[in-house]
Amino acid sequence: MSAYIALADGRVVEGRSRAPGTGRGELVFTTAYTGYEESLTDPSYAEQALTFSYPLIGNYGVREERFESDSVQPRVAVAHEFTEDVADWLEREGIPAIDAVDTRDLVTSIREQGAMRCGVAAGPDATPEQAKAQLEQCVEMSDHTDIGAQVSVDEPQVYEGSGLTVALLDCGAKKSIIDSLTARDAEVHVLPYDSTPEQVAAVEPDLVFVSNGPGDPANFEAAGEVVDAFAGELPIAGICLGQQVVARSLGGQTEKMEFGHRGLNQPVRDLDTDRVIMTTQNHGYSVADPGELAVTQVNVNDGTAEGLEGVGIDVITRQYHPEANPGPHDSLDFFDDVLEMAENHAPAMASD
């Protein structure tokens, strides 16, 4: 069965349909060579068409215990070759899947021209015109102004623990972030992305944590208002989009990257120790100006801010994914650091 990808640069790429349907999104790529289940269920890929640069996707099956959310998140999946397991899974999820594509050429186009809008049509009756019609309806990521509603919980959820209380603003949180906190005995209150400061205060948190998520951080104003309300009063942490939201709230600025960082092998240098770690990343925006925060870690490849910390206030954020899943575990101690920050802050709060 035929499939077509209509690109914003005017080209139409033909491939093979592995899961029928039409779709559209921002065409991006990941260099991850494992972890396709985690990538495909990562809420940060909402409203995107995910291309895998690794040629064979699905060579160790599909297991739900590795999922990072309850469903496949990208609007479209593209690879050089999908196995039957993955193709069947994507078809069950209603996600158009295309393979038999020269993904090297596609990735080169994204690297040279930047992430771009695309439209897709796949199946026995698919035509280039259908793909072009999808492209015409595709908008830029920044125009998805309420994308948080697609990926956040509707109601608060509580994960019991005997330790510190964490208010996690769910802007599209990966399951592994919650698991990393509960593994350290934290009680995690997962709150909707648009929670108010009053709703956050009601759980009496020891730590406010802004999660990862999709799209433009400028579209997560409510989370920024929570950060603004508690900065200096409670410890604050953030991962990926969370770093961007925290930075914007504390006087910083963010910008869209050409094609972003998506993969398992992004090198990050700690400016204090000069140590380099390998990290998992998935983001298309970065912090251009840290505002009131200090840059503590940078990307070795392009110098973008990978770690921020507060100056006189308790804030620690990371642009990469310390929880990995998939990827290296070089930075799992981030969760120990933020919980230690919260624990050390608690006596000071009690004495006020």
Language-model segments: residues:
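Generic structural signal for residues in well-ordered beta-strands
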Residues: 27, 97, 188-190, 254, ...
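Residues that mark the start of a beta-strand
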Residues: 163-167, 187, 235, 278
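Short acidic loop-to-helix transition motifs that present clustered carboxylates
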Residues: 191-198, 216
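Cysteine-nucleophile active-site neighborhood
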Residues: 202, 207, 211-278, 284, ...
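Catalytic beta-strand/loop cores that center a nucleophilic Ser/Cys/Thr
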Residues: 274-312, 352
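A glycine-centered loop/beta-turn motif at secondary-structure junctions
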Residues: 308-349
